[in-house]
């Protein structure tokens, strides 16, 4: 048996630069991880089946699950003769902008690499994972990074300054492809990636909070105004900075002090079913 944790990610910044010939957007984003984790265990099987065990019936256990597809890809890549049972203890909200599915897929690639003693490097696993998900390369490493291209080009950055993170997911799901289809590249939107990069270089917490920006946020807010209300609630309740992560709908707030973080948590806990008080990992 092999055990892996799969931490959630948040975006400090997210920008889309242009539409590529392959249909994807060229992106530029800075991401980090928080200590909200899915936990996965892996067992070899005597047959060649891939079995995903998960308690939540709203999470698929077939080829629609990224962990299943990662296992399928890994077994094909390394021509394995055995299947695997993957048990997922899910804590990261689904369709939330926190890369829960990608984190599980990355954990699966790392876990199977150990389970079958393949000895592949993290770089090799990241390249393999990029075939099925743009956030998977980042999730292979779980380090604060600037991600460009489709997300597969990674430059590691300093860990962010220590801070509390309040995550709040409204009771709705958002499809990332649907949001990306609505991007208007002719419409100006300032994303402060350079400012964020410098803030992390200098471990400047205040500058980091000022740099939080996401080009997808106004698009998701136009469809779901409660996202903006949630963000404003966090800021009014004392968050040093707040932002929608990914394509949403999860909003997070940053706080240096535990008492400050608990105040924000209590302020938003009544309006969202899923609220978490966690720490930055990076």
Swiss-Prot record:
EC numbers for this chain: 2.7.1.148
Residues that hold ATP according to the record: 93-103
Any single GO BP term: terpenoid biosynthetic process
Catalytic activity: 4-CDP-2-C-methyl-D-erythritol + ATP = 4-CDP-2-C-methyl-D-erythritol 2-phosphate + ADP + H(+)
Alphabetized UniProt keyword annotations: ATP-binding, Kinase, Nucleotide-binding, Transferase
Classification via InterPro entries: GHMP_kinase_C_dom (IPR013750), GHMP_kinase_C_sf (IPR036554), GHMP_kinase_N_dom (IPR006204), IspE (IPR004424), Ribosomal_Su5_D2-typ_SF (IPR020568), Ribsml_uS5_D2-typ_fold_subgr (IPR014721)
Pfam families assigned to the protein according to its UniProt record, in alphabetical order: GHMP_kinases_C, GHMP_kinases_N
GO terms of molecular function: 4-(cytidine 5'-diphospho)-2-C-methyl-D-erythritol kinase activity; ATP binding
Residues forming the catalytic site: 9, 135
Database matches in NCBIfam families: ispE (TIGR00154)
Function: Catalyzes the phosphorylation of the position 2 hydroxy group of 4-diphosphocytidyl-2C-methyl-D-erythritol.
Family from the record: Belongs to the GHMP kinase family. IspE subfamily.
Official protein name in the record: Putative 4-diphosphocytidyl-2-C-methyl-D-erythritol kinase
């Amino acid at each position: 048996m092999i055990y892996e944790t799969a931490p959630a990610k948040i975006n400090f910044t997210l920008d889309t630069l242009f539409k590529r010939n392959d249909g994807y957007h060229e992106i530029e984003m800075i991401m980090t991880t928080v200590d909200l984790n899915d936990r996965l265990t892996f067992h070899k099987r005597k047959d060649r089946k891939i079995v995903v065990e998960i308690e939540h019936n709203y999470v698929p256990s077939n080829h629609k699950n990224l962990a299943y597809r990662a296992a399928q890809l890994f077994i094909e890549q390394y021509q394995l003769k055995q299947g695997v049972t993957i048990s997922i203890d899910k804590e990261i909200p689904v369709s939330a902008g926190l890369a829960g599915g990608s984190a599980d897929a990355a954990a699966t690639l790392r876990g199977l690499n150990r389970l079958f003693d393949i000895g592949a490097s993290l770089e090799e696993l990241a390249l393999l994972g990029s075939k099925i998900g743009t956030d998977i390369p980042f999730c292979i490493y779980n380090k604060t990074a600037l991600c460009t291209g489709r997300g597969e080009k990674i430059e590691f950055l300093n860990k962010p300054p220590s801070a509390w993170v309040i995550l709040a997911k409204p009771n709705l799901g958002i499809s990332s492809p649907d949001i990306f289809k609505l991007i208007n590249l002719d419409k100006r939107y300032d994303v402060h990636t350079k400012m964020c990069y410098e803030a992390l270089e200098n471990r400047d917490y205040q500058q980091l909070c000022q740099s939080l920006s996401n080009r997808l946020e106004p698009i998701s807010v136009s469809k779901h105004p409660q996202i903006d209300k949630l963000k404003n609630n966090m800021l009014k309740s004392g968050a040093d900075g707040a932002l929608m992560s990914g394509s949403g709908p999860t909003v997070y707030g940053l706080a240096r002090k535990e008492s400050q973080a608990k105040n924000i948590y209590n302020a938003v806990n009544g309006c969202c079913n899923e609220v978490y008080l966690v720490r930055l990992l990076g």
